């Protein structure tokens, strides 16, 4: 198996992310960028009088990590392993995100949604990465 040496995250010849650390690092960086973008837009709208600051939906911060996960999903060959792993990771991610957002329910939507997005991002990566590899080995 040859490796592609063009940047970060490191990918194998099929375009799959090689390590869990790379997946977590890039997805968390995407989450931070997403949170900063939502904060910037929320601040801009609040300064124009279009609502109070902190009322934007922090769940929007999950867009970049979800895009990364979609690209990694597409890099795996067609089969049940990637679908089952994605469904399990999605269920774990949504559950972790909703629990995190629920525990922070008294906070503004920007913060509680951001915490929910962080819970989703972490849980999805931790379930997807080993899950798809294990299932791909099991199904051949």
Model-derived features: positions:
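Transmembrane alpha-helix entry/boundary detector in multi-pass membrane proteins
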Residues: 40-61, 111-119
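Hydrophobic cores of alpha-helical transmembrane segments in multi-pass inner/ER membrane proteins
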Residues: 1, 60-67, 120-128
